Amino acid sequence: GGGILNSAAKLRGMSEDELFTQAKARLEVMMAQGTVAVEIKSGYGLTVESEIKMLRVVQRLKKELPLRIKATLLAAHALPPEFANDRDAYLDLICNELIPQVKAEGLADHVDTFCETNYFTVAEMERVLEAGAAHDLPGKVHVNQFTSIGGIQAAVKHGALSVDHLEVMEEADLDALTGSRTIPTLLPSCSFFLRIPYGPARQIMDRDLPLALATDHNPGSTPSGNMNLVLSLACIQLRMLPEEAINAMTMNSAAAMGLSEELGSITIGKRASLIITKPVPSLAYLPYAFGNDHIDTVLIDGTPVRAGAVC
């Protein structure tokens, strides 16, 4: 906690092995809670060396653990202190040095930017997305967490795979998403922890948009990777039906990660990565009885990573 820059200062002082050990332990907990695929972002290094360190750890985690992992370069997360008086120089570093190196080493699948008042402007976000596209790294964007500044419209224009947060939405934002290929993603456990407004799930779904759900697991605003909590918050706070919430955190989240062909539904030809619950009276009981552990078994690629009574 303590903000992005505080977390970045701590991460810079950690070795790659320390970072790997801590991240591996968190992912093992998440797998036991039913997560079979995860996107891991950098963004807490804010230097070439530390951002690369984070992404190299992600590659180690991919090799060590069975769950599907996507890596995202989020160097445009906050302005580091050493560039406090020269924003353009930091953007130059990201676009001209960091993105090419990340691509050359095969360290990331996407680029991301925190496009928000007091962080990065729409024009700066567009610059990062353009640099990513030039190196075949599709964009994802943190946007509309606190204010609506036109980031969604620009993200859609640049073909971003997803726009994430969306606690503050205006009609123009919904208009931009309607008919696009960009997936809107809400992060209700972030709203819960920060005590900020929840995203307008029903407004988004009323536009027939494929709403996705995720945790936003990070040290400053969501110190939890538990998707079971997200399911309960989606139904209790976002007013989603259980079927809608489960669809959002499976099929639509897979689409937001670019994994629709592999994951998101129990379908012939896809990976056998799924959970089997303990006996429950109905689907609605899963979000209703919040805080309880309803999972019996977790399978990833057909192999139990948490074996219960049925395995």
PLM feature segments, named:
Residues 4-24, 28, 36-150:
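Metal-coordinating catalytic core of metallo-dependent amide/deamination hydrolases
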Residues 269-272:
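Loop/turn positions that initiate beta-strands
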